[in-house]
């Protein structure tokens, strides 16, 4: 089995990209609290890519202050997202909103260039050609490198890239859906969240394999389900660890059974549950990058080490309920 792609390059990103992205949507950063030691530890661990968004409260500002103090902008790959709907549900997939978000992000980060820029949501009522043209213009202006969509269906991405090819333009080269061992049984936040996890999304995953499209997988550990703080034995207490959105999307019998199997395999291999669940992601013959948000530097190192844990095809199938017993 292919144990995960090793060529960590994304088209139109000038630097190599770490397979693990540091997710900045964690409480201290959202609240605007300086986290210099944590961010230092992220870089020292080998992670060079930060996953951000304009609507992650004060996280971009915290990262910007830290980068200025450390003078480390050129060492990093910065991903940010734009165009998130308002709290009242107004869609924001328009040139005005996208450019406004970009300028605010650039100011918060203290940079004039975002390596990877994604639309946080899609609006199918907006012709995809308009979006491709806008992102190409921003690329030509030197504002962004690679671009793409978060929570975009593969059909819309395919349509966007067909338009780009027909008009000799740069295509979408990154997609950020939910992907992980836990299947998402319900849209966590509403407003068009897209997952490619679970048996019903096999066709989507087949498209990603065929296209070798880089996947930046969010909620890749089920928003706490595979953190090690939830156990199968005490699954009825999961809500003490997982927030209401995670419970809505991931707390179901089939995912708790996946957790049980992760616990069995983790004990067998002498590693953590989160390492097993993360390692599974990289066995799926997809060009996957996993977003992991944690305030614990040692857990971050564990996550990086997960990539080297041996896992057979049969073990991966067992974890995903595709076979009943371990060989």
Model-derived features: positions:
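Short catalytic-loop micro-motif centered on adjacent basic/acidic residues
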Residues: 48-54, 118-119, 145-150
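Active-site-adjacent beta->alpha loops and helix N-cap segments on the catalytic face
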Residues: 59-61, 125-131
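Active-site mouth loops of central-metabolism enzymes
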Residues: 23-33, 85-96, 125
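N-terminal binding-site loop/beta-alpha segment at the start of enzyme catalytic domains
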Residues: 1-77, 140
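Active-site groove signature of glycoside hydrolases
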Residues: 106-127
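Beta/alpha (TIM)-barrel catalytic core signal, keyed to glycine-rich beta->alpha loops juxtaposed to Asp/Glu
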Residues: 128-327
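Short, acidic/polar
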Residues: 30-42, 93-109, 158-162
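A short, structured active-site edge motif that brings together acidic residues
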Residues: 74-87, 174-179
């Amino acid at each position: 089995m292919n144990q995960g792609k090793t060529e960590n390059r994304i088209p139109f990103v000038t630097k190599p990209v770490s397979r693990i992205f540091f997710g900045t949507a964690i409480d201290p950063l959202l609240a605007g609290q300086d986290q210099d030691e944590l961010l230092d530890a992220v870089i020292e661990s080998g992670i060079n890519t930060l996953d951000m968004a304009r609507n992650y409260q004060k996280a971009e500002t915290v990262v910007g202050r830290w980068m200025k103090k450390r003078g480390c902008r050129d060492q990093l790959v910065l991903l940010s997202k734009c165009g998130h709907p308002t709290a009242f549900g107004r869609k924001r997939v328009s040139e005005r909103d996208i450019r406004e978000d970009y300028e605010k992000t650039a100011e918060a980060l203290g940079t004039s260039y975002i390596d990877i820029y994604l639309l946080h949501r899609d609006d199918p009522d907006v012709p995809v050609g308009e979006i491709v043209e806008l992102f190409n213009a921003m690329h030509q202006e030197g504002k962004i490198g690679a671009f793409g969509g978060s929570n975009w269906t593969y059909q819309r991405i395919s349509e966007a890239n067909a338009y780009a090819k027909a008009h000799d333009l740069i295509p979408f080269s990154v997609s950020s859906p939910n992907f992980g061992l836990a299947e998402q049984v319900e849209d966590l936040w509403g407003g068009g969240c897209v997952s490619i996890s679970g048996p019903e999304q096999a066709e989507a995953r087949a498209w990603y394999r065929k296209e070798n499209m880089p996947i930046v997988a969010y909620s890749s550990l089920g928003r706490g389900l595979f953190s090690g703080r939830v156990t199968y034995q005490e699954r009825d207490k999961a809500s003490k660890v997982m927030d209401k959105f995670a419970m809505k999307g991931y707390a179901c019998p089939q995912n708790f059974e996946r957790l049980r199997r992760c616990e069995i395999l983790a004990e067998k291999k002498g590693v953590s549950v989160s390492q097993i669940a993360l390692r599974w992601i990289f066995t799926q013959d997809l060009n996957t990058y996993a977003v992991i948000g944690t305030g614990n530097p040692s857990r971050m190192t564990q996550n990086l080490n997960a990539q080297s844990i041996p896992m057979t095809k049969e073990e991966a199938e067992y974890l995903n309920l595709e076979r009943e017993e371990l060989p």
